[in-house]
Amino acid sequence: PKGNMEDYDVAMSRAVEHFKTQGVTRFIFGDIFLHDVRKYREQQLSPHGIEIVEPLWGKSSEEVMNDFLVSGFRTVVVTTMADGLGADAIGREIDRGFIASLPAGVDPNGENGEYHTFCYDGPIFRQPVPFRLGRSFSQSYDIRLDDGTVKTYSYWFADLQALNTNSDAGTGPASE
């Protein structure tokens, strides 16, 4: 979680060029309704000849979450906005109980950046991804807005650690 938007842009450009050499012409994103995010992605990727595909675009947040909850995928919260869900949500499994616990005004999918997840199991996985949640930590970022002002955003992160399946036991959101 180090760096800034310029670092992100450079990393994304490198990744795009890597995938283009493998014949990739489209990137698929799970955005639902944030026009500024979609515009950013299009501006970032169209110069590289990459088409943006948004299969969830325009669906209701409730429909998307209900589809997810019955899909068989398993995810865990790994990032939250510090002034929103905070550290307490780190490590929580996305399930009906989690969704019911969200404060009023929080998008059930975290579409406004309230939270981000790591998907570790589901119907397309041969086996669950073995991992452990290490200690949570906080990080702040200064982001330059379109009007030139700088705003500080603070987040909580899980220290997500891969487990060696040959020597480490467990799969899923085990915590230290």
List where the protein language model places each region.
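Nucleotide-activated chemistry modules centered on ATP-dependent adenylation/adenylyltransferase
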Residues: 1-176
